[in-house]
A protein has these predicted regions:
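Surface-exposed, low-complexity loop segments enriched in small/polar and acidic residues
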Residues: 1-2, 6, 14-18, 28-30, ...
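Surface-exposed extracellular loop regions of Gram-negative outer-membrane beta-barrel proteins
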Residues: 2-26, 35-68, 72-89, 161-164, ...
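Short loop/turn motifs that connect adjacent beta-strands in outer-membrane beta-barrel proteins
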Residues: 10-17, 52, 86-101, 117, ...
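Outer-membrane beta-barrel signature, preferentially recognizing the C-terminal barrel domain
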Residues: 32-34, 109, 132-178, 208-231, ...
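Flexible, surface-exposed loop regions and adjacent strand-edge segments
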Residues: 33-41, 72-78, 120-128, 195-204, ...
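Solvent-exposed loop/turn elements at secondary-structure boundaries
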Residues: 92-160, 178-215, 253, 257-259, ...
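Conserved small-residue
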Residues: 119-120, 210, 227-334, 376, ...
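Extracytoplasmic gating/loop element in the C-terminal half of outer-membrane beta-barrel translocons
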Residues: 310, 362-454, 459
């Protein structure tokens, strides 16, 4: 069910007023016992003065069945302001150069009621199957048990995000050059997550849902387009874009063992990589005549100390307690999600020929190679080996800059730990597309009833420039 009222009118030739009010009620049946239901109202009011000053107000008041009474509806307002500077009289002397200049800013809130994990009606506790029971002398009578699953939460409500944006649109020489710049900031509050710090003595079989997490995200976007025709034969079209976005976890319900340690996610980006800091490879000088680490060198507790050998990775004792354990893991590198994404390209035309090229790249993105038992020779059986297998530490090749540390005929647990030794910068610049085309003259194609025909050859992912190996 949906109903809408709209109003549009211009007063005195310079006052442009628009208004809209919407009611929406939806029921969606996907085959479950109960259909999904939503309800809400929305409104918009916009005012433009003399095609120069623009203001717009929006709101949404939405309800969700997932929450208890008193928590089901959320109010989400938004406001946008714009100033078309190029329409001002004082811009007329430079109108041949600056054909469009607009300043704009927005602020708004949005909501999310999708809890996740296929969870509906968060205020109702669930009942799940549990262990079975058998009776009788031969245990022939068999029945499944039932127990409480996720406990209902009455104070769960909408997850919200507050978005702020400021931007500028600039057009030069009647649109031959167009530049768009946006700066943005987002703050997400009351994120749905299952609590990890509830003690087992509370009696919950499964973690309890709560509005707990907070995340901030900020960055900027830049895009540039250039179109120019030099003469009847030559023309060029070029574009470039650049996006930078950085997020930070402000609040998260971390396990008690993580709080206050180097492994805490608070204050770090979402998906932050964690690992040990690799200082170097052990050398013969680090061991005594019995093959044990010399006094003063922190013990590494990832395998039997007697298994440590020259060529194994030496890690930093971050907390200075005299031994290296998982507690010494810390934030390393960044995240697998790139913070920088960019691209640029151009198409040059000469008469009926055109040549186009497009590059794509990312920056500030990292990856930890491998994982447990991935080192060659770690009792993995028959299979392919890496082409750089010779770039490894051996007594005859005791270099510190080898790719592989010491290998053995069995797994070397010490060297398989997530650490900066395996951290790689995954930034790259790629020649994404290269295309050469030729448009057949219309005097040829019209003779066979074809309005236009273009022949082209295209290559994709032809070159990649990266420090990764």
């Amino acid at each position: 069910l949906e109903g809408m009222f709209s109003y549009n009118r211009i007063f005195g030739k310079v006052h442009d007023v628009n208004a809209m009010f919407l009611y929406n009620q939806k029921e969606y049946d996907n085959g479950d016992a109960l259909p999904y239901r939503t309800q809400g109202i929305a409104g918009r009011f916009s005012y433009t003065y003399d095609s120069r000053y623009v203001a717009e107000l929006n709101f949404g008041y939405n309800g969700s069945e997932n929450f208890a009474k008193g928590k089901r509806f959320g109010f989400f307002p938004a406001v946008a302001l714009g100033w078309i500077v190029s329409s001002e009289k004082f811009m007329e002397p430079v109108s041949d150069v600056i054909s469009n200049l607009k300043l704009r800013a927005t602020w708004g809130k949005a909501g999310n009621s999708n809890i996740g994990g296929n969870r509906r009606f968060a205020y109702i506790s669930t009942i799940v199957n549990t262990g079975s029971y058998r009776w009788g002398t031969d245990a022939e009578i068999y029945r499944l048990g039932r127990s409480e699953g996720e406990i209902g939460v009455n104070n769960l409500t909408w997850e919200t995000v507050t978005k702020m944006n400021a931007g500028i649109d600039l057009g030069l020489w009647n649109g031959s050059v167009n530049l768009v710049v946006d700066v943005f900031k987002e703050k997400r509050d009351d994120i749905f997550m299952q609590r990890k710090n509830v003690p087992g003595s509370a009696g919950f079989n499964r973690p309890v849902w709560a509005n707990y997490g907070k995340v901030e995200n900020q960055g900027f976007d830049v895009s540039l387009n250039v179109n120019h025709k030099f003469n009847s034969d030559w023309a060029i079209s070029a574009m470039a874009n650049y996006t930078y976005a950085h997020n930070k976890v402000v609040e998260i319900d971390e396990p008690a063992a993580i709080l206050g340690t180097y492994r805490s996610q608070t204050g770090k980006p979402i998906g932050q990589l964690f690992g040990l800091i690799a200082e170097r490879l052990f050398t013969e000088d680090d061991f005594d005549e019995n093959g044990m680490l010399k006094e003063g060198i922190p013990a590494q507790k990832f395998s039997d100390m007697s298994n440590l050998r020259p060529g194994d990775i030496k890690y930093k004792d971050l907390n200075g307690d005299g031994e290296v354990t998982a507690v010494d893991k810390t934030a390393i590198g960044g995240t697998r999600i790139p913070e920088i994404v960019y691209g640029f390209g151009a198409t040059v035309s000469y008469k009926s020929f055109d040549l186009g090229v497009f590059f794509q790249g990312t920056g500030k993105t990292y990856q930890l190679l491998g994982g447990e038992t991935w080192l060659p020779g770690s009792s993995l059986g028959a299979g392919n080996i890496y082409s750089n297998i010779d770039d490894r530490w051996t007594p005859e090749n005791p270099r510190q800059d080898v790719f592989w540390p010491r290998m053995g005929d069995k797994a070397v647990a010490n060297n398989e730990q997530a650490s900066t030794w395996w951290l790689r910068d995954m930034s790259f610049l790629r020649l994404k597309n290269l295309e050469l085309g030729y448009t057949l003259p219309q005097r040829w194609t019209t003779k066979i009833g074809i309005r236009g025909c273009r022949l082209f050859a295209r290559g994709t992912n032809l070159l990649t420039f990266s420090n990764f190996k």
